[in-house]
Amino acid sequence: ANLVFALCREYPNEYGEKIANIALNAYVNQCGQATLAAAEASRENGNSPNTVVSGAVAIVGKKMAEPAMDAAKALLSLFQFSKLSDPTGNYDYKEELNSAKSHKDTLLAANDDTCADKMATCLAQDAQSIFIKFLLDFAKQEGGKPSTDAMIAAIWITLGWVGLRSKKITKGTITR
């Protein structure tokens, strides 16, 4: 909850905490990643735990986060002029579904996206987010599955939507 507050300027509700935890847990398995190598090297050299984590996090650059940032930009471009005020309320997104075809490569998973199925299953259970429902319906419409990065983007936009609409955060906060 504190991490979401730091980014969005408001605490999430129970559902917001649930989806934030799903997003964070998507990155727990670091097997074969440069971040794990940096953390292990830092740990072996006797650094404190916070230095170990800082070293690993410092490895995560814009290039690694770019697919999720692109998905956030795509979702934002689809919904930014909509009348959607509550990201967990009721909203008819048929118009956005029809407009989303140009973002197919950004929003749908490639064959090597191993986390996508598990994450989609978790997010589909008791889905309240308009953005997550939209993403799942778009994938179904296109005969694919949403990418992990697109689901991370949908979670982030769900958490930040009210703050964005009330101008507590900017579009840049959502897309960078």
Task: Outline where the language-model segments fall.
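Hydrophobic alpha-helical bundle cores within soluble ligand-binding/oligomerization subdomains
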Residues: A1-R176
